[in-house]
Amino acid sequence: MLKQLVSGTALVAATLGSSLAFADDDARSSIHITANIPTQQFHVQPRNPDFGKDETMSYNTVSGTLTSLRQTFDVKNTEGSVNAYIEGGPASLYNGSDAIALTTAFNGVTLTATPQEVVDDATSTPGTQADMTIVAATPLATQNGLYTADMTVIFDAVPRVNP
């Protein structure tokens, strides 16, 4: 009986050992795929699909300023113009105690909490490109540390008004 138990245990160990050996040879790759296909009637999308995920404003030690951000967007509204605004109003870089104001403009229009036209009907109907720029105020000499900001820019399709 003991011989059978030892033989059975050895067989199980050999089987598990070979399974574990096969597991060491496995290779896995996780793949996440996203496809965003805009409508033919309305879209506002950055040319760089990674824009806004992790942007960095570098500090220039000579001038004491932060670099600005700039991104080109593809814009189209076949039914009218395009308005934009910043949800909650203009954002600031914040480190927990100090804030550095950010000025965000789209197509040359400074964005606020109030929706305003950023691309007119005639320009948006065939489709166009427009730049978004984000510029930080010059930090004070006492403002140092890691600053972060999160903001959401909302683009609205404004229907054409026929007189």
Q: What are these language model-derived features?
A:
Residues 95-109:
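Short, surface-exposed beta-strand/strand-loop-strand elements in extracellular ectodomains
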Residues 97, 112-116, 145:
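Glycine-centered loop/turn motifs
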Residues 10-11, 21:
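Cleavable N-terminal signal peptides
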Residues 113-127:
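An anionic, turn-rich surface loop/hairpin at beta-sheet edges
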Residues 1-9:
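Bacterial N-terminal signal peptides that target proteins for export
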Residues 16-20:
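N-terminal signal peptide c-region/cleavage motif recognized by signal peptidases
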Residues 22-94, 125-163:
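N-terminal small/polar-rich segments of proteins
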